[in-house]
Amino acid sequence: MIAGSMVALVTPFDAQGRLDWDSLAKLVDFHLQEGTNAIVAVGTTGESATLDVEEHIQVIRRVVDQVKGRIPVIAGTGANSTREAVALTEAAKSGGADACLLVTPYYNKPTQEGMYQHFRHIAEAVAIPQILYNVPGRTSCDMLPETVERLSKVPNIIGIKEATGDLQRAKEVIERVGKDFLVYSGDDATAVELMLLGGKGNISVTANVAPRAMSDLCAAAMRGDAAAARAINDRLMPLHKALFIESNPIPVKWALHEMGLIPEGIRLPLTWLSPRCHEPLRQAMRQTGVLA
């Protein structure tokens, strides 16, 4: 079972916007050393929207090669074209990924039936564990609990990243699906409470900069130690908030650069963190102990 702290890994670029393979390897090693339970490559935080298909597949392969089977690698393969999502999922499988993360189709705004047919088609086309990803704040496309329930019965679909931050929604999803269907948080600030409701982990932005703390938080929540999990979460809360001071992954890439882990690189239309945001984020990093 894929569970625990799953980092939504950034994709490092150099100042010219080229992929930085050395920094990517360094980040993977950092997470292996710091207790991260799984790595999500080329998701939203990994700037999948500004990678071309060849780069997308290269990043997956590089992460898989660096991990060497020590923890699961989940590849982001979602698209708003079902055909493209199938092709990316096939490529991820051939590249050695352990599972795929598939976002709801954005921009074209399918109906609930359209979403069901989209995900069912991908699951039937490619035999690899697949995780649904619901993040309506980015996609303007909200997969309702009843659609998740239908999809939970489709072979190869093993779980969902529920990134609404709505705990009542998460509770309903958990109650509707079978015990073997994995419900993950996609919202750091509410992840503890979702796991205490029965969720199986957190696909985390915060884990990029505080992997050990996030791993400890998830372990405590999943064993039912609410006091310990909430204490860690209270300590991390300034970071949860500051990492969204501008659009993700702008702040988290700046934070990793500040920690000396990646160069200053991001691809348009995203831009480097605004100077007015530097000190608030730096202060949050110091409060949570990730920066001296």
Swiss-Prot record:
GO terms for molecular function: 4-hydroxy-tetrahydrodipicolinate synthase activity. Pathway: Amino-acid biosynthesis; L-lysine biosynthesis via DAP pathway; (S)-tetrahydrodipicolinate from L-aspartate: step 3/4. Keywords: Amino-acid biosynthesis, Cytoplasm, Diaminopimelate biosynthesis, Lyase, Lysine biosynthesis, Schiff base. Its EC number is 4.3.3.7. It is an enzyme of class 4 (lyase). Belongs to the DapA family. Homodimer. This is 4-hydroxy-tetrahydrodipicolinate synthase.
